[in-house]
């Protein structure tokens, strides 16, 4: 799934250069969603991996 987030990130960067519209705009939206999903997953994994003192 991380692979797909990188693919959509590349599409989003290309869309930013060429202008946001059509399929490019959709790729930007998907890239934003995947970014926040992975951010939440990382935060949960980080907090669950810590040991209680």
Curated annotation (Swiss-Prot):
Keywords: Cell membrane, Membrane, Transmembrane, Transmembrane helix. The keyword Glycoprotein does not apply. It is found in: Cell membrane. The chain crosses the membrane at residues 6-26, 28-48. It is a multi-pass membrane protein. The keyword Nucleus does not apply. Pfam families: DUF1328 (PF07043). GO terms for cellular component: plasma membrane. Coiled coil: none annotated. InterPro entries: DUF1328. Belongs to the UPF0391 family. NCBIfam families: PRK13682.1-1, PRK13682.1-4. This is UPF0391 membrane protein Acid_3618. It comes from Solibacter usitatus (strain Ellin6076).
């Amino acid at each position: 799934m991380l692979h797909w987030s990188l693919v959509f990130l590349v599409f989003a960067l290309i869309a930013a250069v060429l202008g946001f519209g059509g399929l490019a705009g959709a790729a930007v939206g998907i890239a934003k969603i995947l970014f926040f999903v992975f951010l939440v997953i990382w935060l949960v994994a980080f907090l669950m991996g810590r040991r209680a003192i």
